[in-house]
Amino acid sequence: LDRTWKPDIVHSHDWHAGLTAAYLAENPAHTAKSVFTIHNLAFRGLFPFGESDDLGFSRRMGFPHQFEFFGNFSFLKAGLVFSDKITTVSPTYAREVLTDAMGFGMQGVLKNRSKDFSGILNGLDYDIWNPKTDVQLVARYDSDDISGKAQCKKDLQKTFGLDENAKGPLFGVVSRLADQKGLDLVLATLGQILALDGQLVVLGSGEPTLEASFRHAAQTHKGHVACYIGYDEVLSHRLVAGSDALLVPSRFEPCGLTQIMALRYGTLPVARRTGGLA
């Protein structure tokens, strides 16, 4: 480490780095300003207070009150209290987390810091996510010539063992399989998808019950439903390009990127109006 280097700004992300700003504030010799970005307020970094004894914070820092969250020590709260500025990943989510319904108990802290708190929408690397130049695709296309998208759909169907069907809608999901993501709604509407002569491809992993449910659906409806439990970067590109619509039914979503990828690839995002999806 270069001990002579002094940063102007230290930018920390989520609860894992929540103590960074507190350590900067603890030592007046550190002149760097701090920014703390919340990606998901549901993860608060809670630990028993007995495990905080060796962290080295003094009473001068308001320890333990400034770190306390309903009897626990919260790394996230430390980031919210001590950072000079706070951001989150979309303007809508920034408004939502100030409410009792979406604040996960931190809404009071955020209201107290409202002058220093803002939402900045996530972006996408258009050099990587570009259907005109994407080397992961069997055919490339853009808004001037979308003929390659039909070839991508055919390739996706072949890759996942689906029936070749150019006319029926192909719905895609690229997601962590978790209750937050609302994917039980996809399972509940599977009959409607099949009634449209539609198909469903799921790429993701997460909660065992959802993994098992999508595996069962794929076994029951071979040729119409397929899933890949896990994550594969190449498959994610091919799925976004080959789908007609991408399903993003999240119950809450700080930002999300798949809907932005879908728009980039001419794939219709079907999303709940919440957070960064709104």
Functional labels for PLM-detected ranges:
Residues L1-A278:
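Catalytic cores of nucleotide-sugar-dependent glycosyltransferases that transfer UDP/GDP/TDP-activated
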